[in-house]
């Protein structure tokens, strides 16, 4: 009987183990040490990366937001009441992704990409990472195509181009969301006749809004037929702060699908003030040191890295665009606060809405003097440029003269005439909600004011005159109107002024 030594046994075992080729998948597993206010402290996840998605044994997911020597802090995306101390946590080795593509259009989803409209599950064309690097310098081209909002004041004086970041800023209840919704609704005119590549797809992101407000927005988009080309990403006020924080990044990833495939997308962030508050709350729970107004030191970076993803790509990369309309809410018109100044410095201009104008009945309540578009004028249509050239000067002179008149100063006849012209111009710029105008209609209306065609009409009758003029032009001068969409030749301008003066004389 032969004796087998321990060395032989070890050699045989080693050969057997080395010859064992069954695939084995290893993953890092840890345990929940503590869970509070949507933040889980996890021990034992060796090799986990910052920003990596982890899965709890209850099925809830989270993302790693802080790393220590033996533990990591995980932001929970969902209800933390389902998580208990001692639950196992597993690394996934993946980053956070959301569904993207044409199949998501017309749906209301949460920031995780799950439908919340009661419809069927979304079968996505692709899944894209929530956090993505913004396009570099050479990947971009200057803004060169206009994005029509349908709002006279914006399209004429503060034009927006495809790929621009234009801030909408103002106090609560001054019509910020109304401007964004009108812009989305106005895209229907273009989208009904354009092919898939030239359509303007839209994404509306509700951050920390009341569920009733989100429902009202969705209802209006459906009612106007705009939901067909729109995605609504909803993170309500009752959702965890982690979900509210994730919302704009998830929506931006959905918009990047269109941008990177040579298409065009408009994204509305409503609003980034609440997003900053959600991030502040999350950072304090993660025990990060607070700074000014208790915001963490990187609050500027969370918005800059988001808004830099909006761009007009070069033709080599398909020429697609992602246009951003971030909304910021101010307190008592204070634009010098921390978050407003941050976002103003990041964006390419701002549309400033004023409570005083709103309460006077001037709507949209846009303060033209404080509003600016730094890059959009390069994309303005030629016909619009020609008629809108003198508008800013006229309105600035009117504001100055109005201040003099308010103090009872006597004005000479020319100043009095300028004041009367300015009043009629301001009245012409008024516009009802959900009633966007085409470029041709805007050119006709502004031309009527610029060439003194409305001087003899009482200020109280200007709105009625505008409605009647547009009805006459649509019904009897369709050919003349269609020629205004690109440029306005002198003979066309003469014919249009003849029609306007004739209507004004018979009004």
UniProtKB/Swiss-Prot annotation:
Compartment(s): Cell inner membrane
Site (Required for activity): 371
Highest taxon in the source lineage: Bacteria
Keywords: ATP synthesis, ATP-binding, Cell inner membrane, Cell membrane, CF(1), Hydrogen ion transport, Ion transport, Membrane, Nucleotide-binding, Translocase, Transport
EC number per UniProt: 7.1.2.2
Catalytic activity: ATP + H2O + 4 H(+)(in) = ADP + phosphate + 5 H(+)(out)
Annotated residues for binding of ATP: 170-177
GO cellular component, one term: plasma membrane
Membrane disposition: Peripheral membrane protein
Chief location bin: membrane
Pfam families: ATP-synt_ab, ATP-synt_ab_C, ATP-synt_ab_N
A GO MF label: ADP binding
Top enzyme class: translocase
Subunit structure: F-type ATPases have 2 components, CF(1) - the catalytic core - and CF(0) - the membrane proton channel. CF(1) has five subunits: alpha(3), beta(3), gamma(1), delta(1), epsilon(1). CF(0) has three main subunits: a(1), b(2) and c(9-12). The alpha and beta chains form an alternating ring which encloses part of the gamma chain. CF(1) is attached to CF(0) by a central stalk formed by the gamma and epsilon chains, while a peripheral stalk is formed by the delta and b chains.
Family stated for the protein in its record: Belongs to the ATPase alpha/beta chains family.
Physiological role: Produces ATP from ADP in the presence of a proton gradient across the membrane. The alpha chain is a regulatory subunit.
HAMAP family tied to this protein: ATP_synth_alpha_bact
Protein name: ATP synthase subunit alpha
Organism of origin: Anaplasma marginale (strain Florida)
Gene name for this UniProt entry: atpA
